[in-house]
Amino acid sequence: MATLLLLPGDGIGPEVCAQVRRVAAALTPDLKVDEALYGGASYDTHGTPLTDEVREQALASDAVLMGAVGGPKWADAPRHLRPEAGLLNLRKAMDVFANLRPAYCFEALAGASSLKPELVSGLDIMFVRELVGGVYFGQPRGIEDLADGQKKGFDTQVYTTSEIERVGRVAFELARGRTNKVHSAEKSNVMESGLLWKQVITELHAREYPDVQLEHILADNCAMQLVRAPKQFDVIVTDNLFGDILSDAAAMLTGSLGMLPSAALGAPGKPGLYEPIHGSAPDIAGKGLANPLAAILSFEMALRWSLKQTEAADALLAAVKAALDNGARTRDLGGSLTTTQMGDAVLAAL
């Protein structure tokens, strides 16, 4: 029996994960769904955002789905014990190096985008973000006192050939099943790591994926083009920092952060890590206002990529589209449905 580990986390996480549990029970009754504390909720109970037991439970599962993590309540906790540290440590432990962050616009929501509907209608971009390297993990890092009384903050951006190659392969393989086009975004004009990134992707393309169209683009120009003409893109592969920024920018083209899922994948046969890209939204937590669709669509990605239940994934994606076509809207989409009522709409469509 396949196992899904739910880590609801903080803020609105438990509310949106409750809807995932309802959908899983209806769509995949044979799926074993476990649940554990994580993030700030774990810190409050166990003094750490990620216990050894939960880490081992995650590694033994077929897929892990998180709700949300963090909030101002834990802002004064030591950095290594903040909820977000639990997320980084779990990613590292699972070695999920490729972050898939789709930015697609459902036809029913084209009018909710910050851009004109004709620019985003039919939008379907897949970001492939390197997830366990780069400036978020590079050493040395820190804040030092200087002799003149000032302080110096520093981080280190580091990438190796193998780290770039493995995420590049994910992007090229995905492109073969889509429109056969990859953009690689970096800053090779000013960063040595960006120069290496461009070289490695170029060599990998020539050696293993000459059938895929490859274009290199500077990350700042990529940000501009996402606003100017986003439908020129299909698969965008980039590093940890730029992937974080660019995929968030693209998310708003779709109408709401509450709509977008993500997947973090490692080696074949290893569990994937799935989560909505929205935050914990502590200002609306417990009020029934959160949009659960990003979490539900994260479950759809888990069905597709880790649990290998493609038909169930297709049915769930169609149900979400049908619910939106029928006018189901939470507050972030200009409607009035509660979190549970949006879950009801998806279940009715199923």
From Swiss-Prot:
Q: Which cofactor does it need?
A: Mg(2+); Mn(2+)
Q: Which GO terms describe its biological process?
A: L-leucine biosynthetic process
From the UniProt record, give the pathway where this protein acts. Answer: Amino-acid biosynthesis; L-leucine biosynthesis; L-leucine from 3-methyl-2-oxobutanoate: step 3/4
Q: Where is this site: Important for catalysis?
A: Y136, K187
Reaction equation(s) it catalyzes: (2R,3S)-3-isopropylmalate + NAD(+) = 4-methyl-2-oxopentanoate + CO2 + NADH
Supply the InterPro entries for this chain.
IsoCit/isopropylmalate_DH_CS, IsoPropMal-DH-like_dom, Isopropylmalate_DH
Q: How is the cofactor bound?
A: Binds 1 Mg(2+) or Mn(2+) ion per subunit.
Please verify whether the record's keywords include Amino-acid biosynthesis.
yes
Annotated NAD(+) binding sites = 71-84, 279-291
- Enzyme Commission number, as recorded: 1.1.1.85
From the UniProt record, which GO molecular function terms apply?
A: 3-isopropylmalate dehydrogenase activity; magnesium ion binding; NAD binding
Q: Name the major location.
A: cytoplasm
The record's annotation in Pfam families points to: Iso_dh
Residue positions annotated to bind substrate are R91, R101, R129, D220
User: Where in or outside the cell?
Assistant: Cytoplasm
The free-text function statement in the UniProt record for this protein reads: Catalyzes the oxidation of 3-carboxy-2-hydroxy-4-methylpentanoate (3-isopropylmalate) to 3-carboxy-4-methyl-2-oxopentanoate. The product decarboxylates to 4-methyl-2 oxopentanoate.
Oligomer and partners: Homodimer.
Q: Which family does it belong to?
A: Belongs to the isocitrate and isopropylmalate dehydrogenases family. LeuB type 1 subfamily.
Q: PANTHER family of this UniProt entry?
A: 3-ISOPROPYLMALATE DEHYDROGENASE
Q: What is this protein called?
A: 3-isopropylmalate dehydrogenase
